[in-house]
Amino acid sequence: MKRLALVLALLTVSGLAHAKKTCTDQPKEKWMKEEDFKKRLESEGYKIRKFKQPGSCYEIYGTNKEGKKVEIYFNPVDGTVVKEVVE
C-alpha cells in the first residue's frame, strides 16, 4: 500500500512539473504581434528554428547570439523571459 501511495505521489509531482507555463494573464489584444516579436528576437541575435504559442506564452527553439541551442518561454506582453534552457 505504501508503495502505491509513493508511485501516485511521484506521478502527481511529475505531472505538475510538465504543466504549461503561465507567462501572462493579459488578454491577447495586449500581446505583441508574433511577427514583430520574432523580428525583435532576430535583431538581438537569436536564430529561431521553431516558434510556438503554448497557453499564455511565446516559446522559441533555436540558437542564441553565442550559437548555443535554446528553449525560451517569453511573456508575450512585454517580452520578458519566463524560463530559459540553454544547452
PLM segments and residue spans:
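Cleaved targeting-peptide boundary
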Residues: 18-27
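N-terminal targeting signals for Sec/Tat export/insertion, comprising classic cleavable signal peptides
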Residues: 27-56
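Hydrophobic "anchor" residues
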Residues: 69, 80-81
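Conserved histidines in hydrophobic membrane contexts and catalytic metal-binding motifs
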Residues: 41, 60-63, 74, 79
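A short, surface-exposed interaction/processing loop segment used at functional sites
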Residues: 81-87
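N-terminal signal peptide c-region/cleavage motif recognized by signal peptidases
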Residues: 14-16
